[in-house]
């Protein structure tokens, strides 16, 4: 994994992986990942999935992993790779006419808001979070 992502994007130390456990799990069931992987591109995601498949290791994906009520970024099978898409945080396109934004999965509400303001957009953004939550994660959670 380090060859595919760089050592700084493969977390294996317990302190570095603390955000990827479920703090509300029953005692002894922390749902600890085997490693946290932080890809920064589609190609890196593909490489991670290829390697995980070759080794039969389950992958648990999250965009920000902040939804603590649902276990956050914690995998349901201990030892799984926690695949965090946080580094994929670019706003790729904003279509003013159709009121649409194309974003990578790690884009937070803060990121989209800042992009709209910096670009001079006239679009107004309704934010269902304090700002650090995931645009994509929130949309998927609510069936958009």
Q: Across the structure, where does each feature detected by a protein language model lie?
A:
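Short active-site loop/helix that positions an aromatic residue
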Residues: 111-118
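Extended, alpha-helix-rich binding/interface surfaces that flank or overlap catalytic cores
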Residues: 106
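N-terminal flexible segment immediately upstream of the FAD-binding catalytic core
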Residues: 1-50, 54, 66-99, 128, ...
